[in-house]
Amino acid sequence: MKKLILYPLSILLFLSTNLAAQTCCQLETMGDYQLLGGSLDFIRAHAEPLPFTFVSKEGGEMVSFPTKDSTGKAGGFLIKAKKKSKKWLLVYQEWWGLNDYVKKQAEAFYTDLGGEVNVLALDMYDGKVATKREDAGKYMGEAKEERLESIMQGAVKFAGKRAQFASVGWCFGGGLSLKSAIVEGKRAVGCLMYYGMPIKDVEKLKTLNTDVKGYFSGREKWINKTVVEEFAKNMTTAGKVLDYKIYDAEHGFANPSNPAFDKAATEETYAASIKYLKMKFGI
């Protein structure tokens, strides 16, 4: 395992043949990652999720909370700790939206953390969930940086003044997880990211209050080895720690609805994530 660090988010969008030829090597911010929503290559690399319905066994339910922007509110899937707790895990969706696969994974984290942590899977698309990859690309591309950050800020306030946070996300959510750690400020205690686009802005990375643990794909052409190694250098420059591993697997390897699902890599990363979170939360 190597040591390293992570990234932000921004805005802008879209399209055309130019974009289809663009790779993640050329993309520098979260907003740049959103540009991939118009890339045919990137869209076609994502198989559509199989139908799945999740029913919570731990009392998970949809909740809403205020935000300071013009929308005024946001939502998420919340599973409360069995006893009152200041520990919160914020879970960030893939580009599909807050679907039942994400809710199931959020509940798995809750269960394997012994019910000692409040787990909140945030709805970053305000109720929109894609089942078609073209829609997923559209939703990701349309997401505004200001709105995404407002949702994060609302969640932090919803958790309470004494809350401490860790975050986890996949794909689009991997980038959001890093951004979340920055938004959480001094109350951030941990950050996990799965094959998410890193932040290049060293000044923003310097504001992190936590290390970052990352899992990346060695077979994809977007967030590839070059991108990850540059991220590692930027983290070092920022004086932060990134603990990462590049797997011999495709983008989306931890998604069970993905034909590229890699069971061994998924089990290894999940076990490492639970160990990391238990250490960070003192469980």
Q: Model segments located where?
A:
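Alpha/beta-hydrolase fold nucleophile elbow
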Residues: 159-170
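Gly/Ala-rich beta-loop-alpha elbow adjacent to hydrolase catalytic centers
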Residues: 169-173, 177
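A conserved short beta-strand
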Residues: 187-197
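Acidic catalytic loop of the alpha/beta-hydrolase fold
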Residues: 219-223
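C-terminal catalytic histidine-bearing segment of alpha/beta-hydrolase fold enzymes
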Residues: 238-283
